């Protein structure tokens, strides 16, 4: 008798993508992050759903409702901190996932890669709107500063900002719509994830060598299911340690002060996972230029496949490109550090140099290095 998982209309879809999926035999732990991101998304949707049951999106009560969740709701504190720190875990996994794809040349699967970039933008938008909801000082001023950037768009900028605000400043209308979109976007992200996987399974997974692995495939289950569970346990250990021992480690103390439009915090800065982009934004003295650089810091990933000059897909056997890749990682860490510092000497100039280096590595040095390596290999 044929197994039900291979014949049932719904189960056979799951079977072909989670059980009998042929996968390259050489996948390392760097390929774990896709499943970890899926689990992060599920955790965020579940904790968010339960938080939404107790949260009120009104400027008068939003801050108090979050306090009420932490103090009076059964296990509300753990829900709130799982959701807040789960976002940090989400971004750690996201950045490692993107880094893996850059290193091993997975961006040559352009459809999967482009959907991934859209997903990255969607997750960033969701996280930004979520940060506004507790209605603390940093929530209010973060929302004011970031939405105000749209006023740099010629002609329609000011009208656009007021349209997004629903008035002449960040107020009740803004908070309500941010809550609505923050609730909606994760479900759109879930749909995009399905499309991401659909395109991935059209081509099959890349592998560390970058060489086609059609001759050497193994079933996804049990080999990679077990491997993914190990990654999951490590991530859950890290997340629960963070939540239970220092839940506010990655947060901003200013957000424990209720929003006050009359009092600006000394240093307005976003959550740590946006600091690299924030540093690039601040490095350019012109407002419109800064906004463009901010968007391009992520959008530049879309042209990476066009800039692939090497005849090898992966960086596994390309030491010069590897050096550049790790220089890029160090540069991003430096930008993250700069984004959290005040706008004063020497941080400004360090940020400007790091921003120029970031775009130079991706747009100039990596393609040139690929050409040079081809020449060195006499190809």
From Swiss-Prot:
It is a multi-pass membrane protein. One of its GO terms (cellular component) is respiratory chain complex III. This is Cytochrome b. The gene is MT-CYB. GO terms for molecular function: metal ion binding; ubiquinol-cytochrome-c reductase activity. Belongs to the cytochrome b family. Heme b b562 binds at residues 83, 182. Component of the ubiquinol-cytochrome c reductase complex (complex III or cytochrome b-c1 complex) that is part of the mitochondrial respiratory chain. The b-c1 complex mediates electron transfer from ubiquinol to cytochrome c. Contributes to the generation of a proton gradient across the mitochondrial membrane that is then used for ATP synthesis.
